[in-house]
Amino acid sequence: MDNLSNYLIVSAVLFSIGTIGVLTRKNAIVVFMCIELMLNAVNLTFVAFSRHLGNLDGQIFVFFIMTVAAAEAAVGLALFIAFFNNRESIDIDDANLMKW
């Protein structure tokens, strides 16, 4: 049986875990993984609504989100590598020193 509320609860829990991780962690890679977890929670919501409503619009939109997330991962990891080569650390507090 397809119960929409179960999928939405799981999605909300995943999004909450990702939000807590972004707000509390100081390691840039862990924060990046939490952002990806939040994006996957949104994808789960889109797929759940798409299946519940019986159309494919939500599933097509998920493919666009996954494409943007892949580009974000490539650019984000490249920035982390450049930052690590500069500062020898991937701590979020050290990134604050990059301001003018």
Swiss-Prot record:
| Quaternary structure, from the entry | NDH-1 is composed of 14 different subunits. Subunits NuoA, H, J, K, L, M, N constitute the membrane sector of the complex.
> According to Swiss-Prot or TrEMBL, what is its membrane topology?
Multi-pass membrane protein
The UniProt entry's GO CC annotations, sorted and at most eight, read:
NADH dehydrogenase complex; plasma membrane
Task: From the record, give the transmembrane residue ranges.
Answer: 4-24, 29-49, 60-80
What protein name applies here? Answer: NADH-quinone oxidoreductase subunit K
Keywords (alphabetical) are: Cell inner membrane, Cell membrane, Membrane, NAD, Quinone, Translocase, Transmembrane, Transmembrane helix, Transport, Ubiquinone
Q: Which NCBIfam families match?
A: PRK05715.1-2, PRK05715.1-3, PRK05715.1-5
To which species is this protein native?
Trichlorobacter lovleyi (strain ATCC BAA-1151 / DSM 17278 / SZ) (Geobacter lovleyi)
- What's the Enzyme Commission number for this chain? 7.1.1.-
Family named by the database record: Belongs to the complex I subunit 4L family.
Q: What does this protein do?
A: NDH-1 shuttles electrons from NADH, via FMN and iron-sulfur (Fe-S) centers, to quinones in the respiratory chain. The immediate electron acceptor for the enzyme in this species is believed to be ubiquinone. Couples the redox reaction to proton translocation (for every two electrons transferred, four hydrogen ions are translocated across the cytoplasmic membrane), and thus conserves the redox energy in a proton gradient.
Mind listing the GO molecular function terms for this protein? NADH:ubiquinone reductase (non-electrogenic) activity; quinone binding
